[in-house]
Structures are given as C-alpha cells and as structure tokens.
Design a protein with these regions (language model features):
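Chalcogenol-based redox active-site neighborhoods
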Residues: 1-153
Length: 153
C-alpha cells in the first residue's frame, strides 16, 4: 500500500491518548488536524517534534487546528513521556494495538522496523487529507511550514 495522497478522505482511525481517552479522528471534523507521526517516544528528535507542537498550541487554535502526536508506543509510555517532557495540552496518541494500524492505514508504517515514518498529515475540516510529507528520521518537521499549510486551507 502506498502513502495516502492529498484529496483522499482520512480513513476511520480510533486511538487512545496519553490519558486513556478514546479518540475517533473522523469525529473531529470541522477542526483541521495535524497528525504528527513520530517513530518512538523517549528519543531526542521525537521529543523536539512534540515540543514544537506544544509550543504552537495557540497558533494552531487560531487556525482552527489541532495537532496530535502519534507513535506505536503504548498508552502508559505516552503518559510517562508526556509528563517527563512537559506536554500537557497536546494529545499524544498510541498506535500500539493493533500494532501500527493507524500508520498502516495511511501507508506510513515501516514494517521491517515496527515503527511509523516521521511524517506530517494535514486533514481539513471535512476529513479530507490535504498535505502529506515524510521526513528523514533525523529531521524535526518544520512547524513553520506546517502552520503555513494549515493557514492556506
């Protein structure tokens, strides 16, 4: 399966956040979504990626957008990591079981490694994917570019 392309609807995805709340991504319509996939918690680049989301919560709200951090880590790990790095507003979603199902549904799962790509997927308020970018594992996604993309929607 290839990577989801702009113009396609976001598939049905249900995940739990770091506080064990069920999140149905398709129910978040009328809000733009920035799905920020990161390979694993407890790694430096992933930490900087999530800190960039947290630092831009107000900017995202002004754009009627919400950022969600997603990785294959289990919920307790997401909770401990969020607490350790000071993430208190941004929801960190667990794609742990079925392992990598959300990433797989978007064509972003690295089967050989058991993790997702580092990627950003932007979804408009109608549930349509409008932007997809896969980043090198060593690179923090450019939050400025992502905010500009959201602003243009």
């Amino acid at each position: 399966m290839g990577i989801i392309q702009p113009g396609n609807p976001l598939p049905t995805i249900h995940l739990k956040d770091q506080d064990k709340n069920e999140v149905d991504l398709t129910s978040l319509k009328e809000t733009k979504l920035l799905l920020s996939f990161h390979p694993l918690a407890w790694t430096g680049v992933c930490q900087r990626q999530m800190e960039a989301l947290e630092a831009n919560v107000e900017a995202l709200e002004k754009l009627n957008a919400q950022a969600l951090g997603i990785s294959v880590d289990p919920v307790p790990s997401k909770k401990a990591w969020a607490d350790a790095i000071g993430i208190s507003i941004t929801r960190l979603l667990s794609d742990f079981w079925p392992h990598g199902a959300a990433a797989t549904s978007l064509g972003l799962f690295r089967e050989a490694d058991g993790i997702s790509e580092r990627a950003a997927v932007i979804v408009d308020g109608e549930g349509i994917v409008r932007f997809v970018k896969v980043y090198p594992m060593s690179e923090v996604p450019d939050i400025g570019e992502l905010l500009e993309t959201l602003k243009a929607l």
